[in-house]
Amino acid sequence: MNTLEPAAQSKPPGGFKLWLSQLQMKHGRKLVIALPYIWLILLFLLPFLIVFKISLAEMARAIPPYTELMEWADGQLSITLNLGNFLQLTDDPLYFDAYLQSLQVAAISTFCCLLIGYPLAWAVAHSKPSTRNILLLLVILPSWTSFLIRVYARMGILKNNGVLNNFLLWLGVIDQPLTILHTNLAVYIGIVYAYVPFMVLPIYTALIRIDYSLVEAALDLGARPLKTFFNVIVPLTKGGIIAGSMLVFIPAVGEFVIPELLGGPDSIMIGRVLWQEFFNNRDWPVASAVAIIMLLLLIVPIMWFHKHQQKSVGEHG
């Protein structure tokens, strides 16, 4: 005999699931847009405000080693702001030299990465489809190992009795080992080796998106290959060049491990200064001021990159 199931078992979904579905229908787009902003607030704005607060404090023999900005005393709120940390950066030429050398090293390293990365990206983009993925894997593969291990490997290659000097001695190019390790040259080599994949990938992405009918049209109109490259291909891959340059330049400015292990006493980059102020001198307020100024310097290329991206979207949109 057929029996009817209780009506309670076939009732429509309700409760939390119904509320969640209604929330997605009404505010789904707003929630999707809000997620990146929440990410930026938690991982960028909030740490920035904490560092900025410390930069306005004074050094103290305490844990943490700085004074509080706001204190309650006799029922009143006392606010003490110390701008002396920022003034100290202008008085001591060490900080100015560190900023200048960091920007110089980052700029030259970025240019070297571009000189190496563009031909490499071109070779990968114009390789056979069967070997393209293998070449991309070879570009990315070093990034899968520890960054510190890769830097130590550079030390083994660049030292006086390392692989490079032994190879040059075997060829008879040099009579005695070259002093490369613990010099500025070693810093450049280490940064270029570490960050060249970040230059290759954006340029490769731009190259495979090129409409090569434009290149063929330029050649048909009598343009030479070199002129076609600089007047057609380079402008079409400008977005990849700028993106790769930002991915190399920004982290290279604050690099610490490579100058510390490969550089010498003359390699005074801002990352090493930050380390000394935080851990050796335990002067967190001054170190925070150094970090704030470095961040403000990096905002300039970031804003320029953002402006270029908006312009590119407007031209293609």
Model-identified regions with their sequence ranges:
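Membrane-interfacial helix termini and adjacent extracytoplasmic/periplasmic loops
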Residues: L18-Q22, L69-D74, V151-V192, L226, ...
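Transmembrane alpha-helices
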Residues: L35, L137, L141, Y193, ...
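N-terminal signal-anchor/first transmembrane alpha helix
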Residues: K11-I54, E58, N133, L137-L138
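Interhelical loop and adjacent transmembrane-helix boundary motif
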Residues: L23-R29, M59-A62, W72, F86-L89, ...
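Short membrane-interfacial helix/loop motifs at transmembrane-helix boundaries
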Residues: L45-P93, I157, G264-P265, G317
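C-terminal transmembrane helix and the adjacent membrane-cytosol boundary/short C-terminal tail
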Residues: N2-E5, Y204-L219, P285-G317
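Transmembrane alpha-helix signature in integral membrane proteins
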Residues: D92-H126, P225
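Cytoplasmic-entry segments and transmembrane alpha-helices of multi-pass inner-membrane transporters
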Residues: V32-I33, L120-I157, V215-E216, F229-F230, ...
